[in-house]
Amino acid sequence: MDIVGGQNLRQMWDDLAEVYGDKTALIFESCEGIVRQFSYASLNEEINRTANLFHSLGIRKGDRVALHLDNCPEFIFCWFGLAKIGAIMVPINARLLGEESAWILQNSQVSLLVTSAQFYPMYREIRQGNSTPLNHICLIGEQLPADDGVSLFSQLQARQSATLCYTPALSTDDAAEILFTSGTTSRPKGVVITHYNLRFAGYYSAWQIALRDDDVYMTVMPAFHIDCQCTAAMPAFSAGSTFVLLEKYSARAFWGQVRKYQATVTECIPMMIRTLMVQPAAPTDRQHHLREVMFYLNLSAQEKDAFTERFGVRLLTSYGMTETIVGIIGDRPGDKRRWPSIGRVGFSYEAEIRDDQNRPLPAGEIGEICIKGIPGKTIFKEYYMQPEATARALEPEGWLHTGDSGYQDEDGYFYFVDRRCNMIKRGGENVSCVELENIISAHPKIQDIVVVGIKDAIRDEAIKAFIVLNEGETLSEAEFFSFCENNMAKFKVPSFMEIRTDLPRNCSGKIIKKNLK
């Protein structure tokens, strides 16, 4: 089923501007509370001016341009402005440091970067090191540094026409983006995402949450992340909805922002749900218009139930990854939830559980979750310049090996067990980190928890728990280990525990385990 046809992102925005005109497309709120708002017509003009800006700097179809930005309207301008001229966006995680950012610039062969004054000193050092092909920086800010090869985004954009001046032929198979994976266990890989991928994501994710043009979709997810782009922005724009982009997440401000913008849909990661739950209860907790809250792994059933009971919202599970573009397994708005199931496979996809010999497994047996899609259309096209890595993950028939363990029941509902790399091998037993984390998170003194495997000369691996306590709490080792012994099999009880003030996380809220080992 082809729901995109031949429509690329340039055509999408031209059509949206014509159909929705003065309807509000984008609302942005900064950390200081400054609000900027754009209609579909005015946003398309900003996108065109930005496309012309890139053309004036020598960018042509197929060229790669990096963005290192926090959430801001300019990210949206650049994303679609580059797509309109057939150039390729390379978004960089705003939390990355110099060496990691330079590595991405080098591996994607980027010569032009758009960034803000906050990150400029880091890139000045990178350019001085001559380790990358970066030769020009377009700066979002008020003051132009006295350095060669730097220009102000606002000045350049203001000089441009609102009519597109460069319109090369585009195909939906053309790359629109190279999105580097989070790299929690190794160097990130560049996931190539096409015009078709993004257009499909818009239609698919809008279907997943039954999105309409009178909806308001609010997100605090970082714009450089697949969730913001393909689960929030693309469906909101594709449906003619209003997209509300907040610069940063604040647990104290979140519900006020939901009410302020009358948001009907939002998305949360587990960290957000947990921090919202520790805010003081208020009479206004249920005074909002939210009908769906999309969330991503992992939450325990107790956490889900407590959240929905307190705030009166429906949680909608969505399971996916950068390579799948969207949440290919999940709940549907009209379905009864079957927790702890992560839902059923969505349209245009197939899913199987396979063993170590790549053979399908029957219901109830744990194996690897494998997804079948169409490369470059419903799943990613390839890893940039890494054919061997592409071949390992993606079979010729379109089967993608997720690296996740799970099983399905007789009714086709899928259950996530753990990342295969998160399975701890302890004395011949496979122990799921997620299972232990869900059990330990039920302790009333514990706010956050992560479990890792560490080398053990006798039993392959020992289990260590890193813990963040609720404010004002103390927890002894004896109390912790007693709780574990009473709630899990003996071979699953951690050997070590360490209390920390926080845990290292990437932009999507995933804990960076390599920083803990």
Curated annotation (Swiss-Prot):
Q: Which GO terms describe its molecular function?
A: carnitine-CoA ligase activity; crotonobetaine-CoA ligase activity; medium-chain fatty acid-CoA ligase activity
EC code: 6.2.1.48
Keyword field contains Ligase: yes
List GO BP terms, alphabetically. carnitine metabolic process; fatty acid metabolic process
Q: Does the keyword Lyase apply?
A: no
* Keywords (A to Z) from UniProt: Ligase
Catalytic activity as recorded in UniProt: 4-(trimethylamino)butanoate + ATP + CoA = 4-(trimethylamino)butanoyl-CoA + AMP + diphosphate; crotonobetaine + ATP + CoA = crotonobetainyl-CoA + AMP + diphosphate; (R)-carnitine + ATP + CoA = (R)-carnitinyl-CoA + AMP + diphosphate
The highest taxon in the source lineage is: Bacteria
PROSITE patterns named among the record's database cross-references: AMP_BINDING
**Pathway stated in the Swiss-Prot or TrEMBL entry:** Amine and polyamine metabolism; carnitine metabolism
- UniProt cross-references to CDD domains, sorted A to Z: FACL_DitJ_like (cd05934)
Q: Which Pfam families match?
A: AMP-binding, AMP-binding_C
The family this protein is said to belong to: Belongs to the ATP-dependent AMP-binding enzyme family.
Question: Which PANTHER family does UniProt cross-reference here?
Answer: ACYL-COA SYNTHETASE, MEDIUM-CHAIN ACYL-COA LIGASE ACSF2, MITOCHONDRIAL
Main role?
Catalyzes the transfer of CoA to carnitine, generating the initial carnitinyl-CoA needed for the CaiB reaction cycle. Also has activity toward crotonobetaine and gamma-butyrobetaine.
Q: What protein name is recorded for this chain?
A: Crotonobetaine/carnitine--CoA ligase
- Tell me which species this is from: Salmonella paratyphi A (strain AKU_12601)
Tell me the classification of the organism that encodes this protein: Bacteria, Pseudomonadati, Pseudomonadota, Gammaproteobacteria, Enterobacterales
